[in-house]
């Protein structure tokens, strides 16, 4: 695709996941039946950290969306509803599904769907694609945090430390308190088995000097997708 010279319209949007409001930003070029791109931010982050991707995707013809996960940002950076203690990778999959449904309901979007995610958002995007393999045309993963299940089993997730055999109700993780549901959702997960139902196009980008998510997780994912 070539960069479009047409103006990009930017607007805020909201949609619902149960009784929680998800808030985000749409970047829309001119046209009809536009392909959709959903971009997911990482742990403790917010939509601001991935807006550069949505902007570029809109310039090459996508109707692109970024949003704040419910409870997925360091307070008060996130604009969506929800407590950080109620957030998990699986609730973020549900958020992604809600944004996809919203985007697909609009009169100017088509059937083509690209999912993109960074770090934890990469794992969320991969799990979402695995749940909807026929709906997702392309999957782009930047340093996807497939380490999260292993970290939960080891009892350390970023700044959080806990006994994996006796999960506490509340977990201290620097400026972002987590709930028991965060490790509980993934502690028994075989993530590389979970992602393999998706057989479409996948691009994985991962720096070899990453000290948080080791690049061998990206290599394992590439092998799982092969």
Question: Model-flagged regions — what are they?
Answer:
Residues 211-217:
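Conserved alpha/beta-hydrolase "acid-adjacent" motif
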Residues 49, 85-106:
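Alpha/beta-hydrolase active-site loop
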Residues 1-31:
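N-terminal cap/lid segment of alpha/beta-hydrolase-fold proteins
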Residues 131-178:
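Hydrolase active-site cap/lid region
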Residues 198, 204-206, 210:
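Short beta-strand/loop motif that positions the catalytic acidic residue
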Residues 107-118:
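Alpha/beta-hydrolase fold nucleophile elbow
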Residues 43-55:
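The serine-hydrolase catalytic nucleophile loop
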Residues 54-79:
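Conserved alpha/beta-hydrolase
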